[in-house]
């Protein structure tokens, strides 16, 4: 079997040959933990989980390392912490926000059937690596200190001879195009409009660390340097796959390439760059102003979208019906179609023992061709191969959902509402009794909070 993946940098589908087949390495940009993950955030999580599963199948579980970071230092986090916990010192409020949001993220992606990455590094745990890279860039003439900031110079990078790539190659943009697209209000301490921040001074009360480059005041990292540092720490100077959403190609991934290649004097940071396409909702861009902004948690736990809650397996299958590089239209109709298929497959495979299915593997090996993969799943159902269908579903992380869960859904939701009311009036004895009743129905509860901080309870059928 030949695995072929589309590389954003070369703009072609290429045979995937790992640098070391005994240690296949993949990095994917993870969440900034300040708010609930929305359904658009779920797309790269699901897409690269499927790739992770495929790589483990091909090379062995022990030989694949998947790193997905947690960004826990960011202006959005600071703003959310100050808003939600105005009575606490900012650093303590930030800790509460990041810990709570990270847990919410994990609960959501677990419900989507995603495996945990091999490593999930937090940015704040890698400040030393960030300073190290920045000092290398200053020493190499690629970065400079100005007004207590450290800035990277794409002009300096492109002026160097040798193995370094051209800045703008990943996004397929020239420096002139970038300058033309830069904002008019360029910071006065920048030498050039395309220069970007590696390190900046912290405001009073904000998270801060000793600065690189001999800067006397404490500061904090820019966004782009964080991923260069974490990928270097856990995967090395050069690794196999770097993934994320198409919106990250520029400037985030372009700047990662610049930082890492200049710091380590290499022509490539990752051998293959993969990016998933945008998501829209019912034919429109998702936005709060249009009222179509929906989080993973809302899809799982409320009737906001389509008048019902959706099982994580349904969301996962609906996401995979569109090829990862194409835009996806997230619709209620698509969810109903996915739900119908999963109900049918679940009944068909309920007495089966899983068996391998080469046709599904071959579809995935062709640049994660999930539409073809789903056609193969329907084909297995049509020709009566429950063992192969079950094996394929397990490989893909698509859990089985049975029709009787519809009845459980109605009863469980009523009991959950009664339990929520009991908890609100601090009747914990009644709350525990209802929890036990649900457990007897085979329902496992998970308590959390919604995007507004209100208590919300999700549930799943015990496996």
Curated annotation (Swiss-Prot):
It comes from the Bacteria. One of its GO terms (biological process) is cysteinyl-tRNA aminoacylation. It holds the Pfam family tRNA-synt_1e. A motif ('KMSKS' region) lies at residues 285-289. The keyword Zinc applies. Zn(2+) binds at residues 29, 227, 252, 256. It is found in: Cytoplasm. GO terms for molecular function: ATP binding; cysteine-tRNA ligase activity; zinc ion binding. Its cofactor is Zn(2+). This is Cysteine--tRNA ligase.
């Amino acid at each position: 079997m030949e695995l072929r993946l589309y590389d954003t940098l070369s703009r072609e589908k290429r045979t995937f040959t790992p640098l070391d087949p005994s240690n296949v390495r993949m990095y994917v940009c993870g969440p900034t933990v300040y708010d609930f993950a929305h359904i658009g955030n779920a797309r790269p999580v699901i897409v690269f989980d499927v790739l992770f599963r495929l790589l483990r199948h091909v090379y062995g579980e022990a030989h694949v390392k998947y790193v997905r970071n947690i960004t826990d230092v960011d202006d959005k986090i600071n703003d959310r912490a100050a808003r939600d916990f105005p009575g606490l010192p900012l650093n303590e409020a930030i800790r509460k926000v990041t810990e709570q949001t990270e847990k919410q993220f994990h609960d959501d992606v677990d419900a989507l059937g995603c495996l945990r990455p091999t490593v999930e590094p937090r940015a704040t745990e890698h400040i030393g690596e960030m300073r190290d890279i920045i000092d290398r860039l200053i020493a190499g003439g690629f970065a400079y200190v100005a007004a207590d900031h450290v800035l990277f110079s794409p002009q300096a990078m492109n002026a160097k001879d040798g193995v370094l790539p051209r800045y703008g190659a990943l996004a397929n943009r020239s420096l002139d195009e970038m300058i033309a697209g830069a904002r008019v209000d360029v910071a006065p301490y920048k030498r050039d409009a395309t220069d970007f921040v590696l390190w900046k001074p912290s405001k009073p009360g904000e998270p801060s660390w000793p600065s690189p480059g001999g800067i006397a005041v404490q500061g904090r990292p820019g966004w782009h340097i964080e991923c260069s540092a974490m990928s270097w720490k856990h995967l090395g100077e050069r690794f196999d796959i770097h993934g994320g959403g198409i919106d990250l190609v520029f400037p985030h991934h372009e700047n990662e390439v610049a930082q890492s290649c200049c710091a380590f004097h290499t022509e490539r940071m990752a051998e293959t760059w993969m990016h998933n396409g945008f998501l829209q909702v019912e034919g429109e861009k998702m936005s709060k102003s249009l009222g179509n902004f929906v989080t993973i948690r809302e899809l799982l736990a409320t009737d906001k979208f389509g008048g019902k809650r959706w099982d994580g397996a349904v969301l996962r299958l609906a996401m995979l019906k569109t090829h990862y590089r194409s835009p996806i239209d997230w619709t209620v109709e698509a969810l109903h179609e996915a739900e119908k298929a999963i109900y049918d497959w679940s009944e068909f495979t309920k007495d089966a023992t899983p068996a391998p299915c080469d046709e599904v593997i071959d579809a995935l090996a062709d640049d994660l061709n999930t539409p073809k993969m789903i056609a193969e799943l329907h084909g297995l159902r049509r020709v009566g191969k429950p063992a192969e269908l079950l094996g394929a579903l397990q490989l893909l992380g698509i859990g089985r959902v049975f029709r009787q869960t519809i009845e459980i859904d109605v009863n469980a939701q009523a009991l959950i509402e009664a339990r929520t009311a009991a908890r609100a009036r601090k009747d914990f004895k009644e709350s525990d009794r209802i929890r036990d009743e649900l457990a007897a129905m085979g329902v496992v509860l998970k308590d959390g909070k919604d995007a507004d901080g209100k208590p919300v309870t999700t549930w799943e059928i015990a496996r």
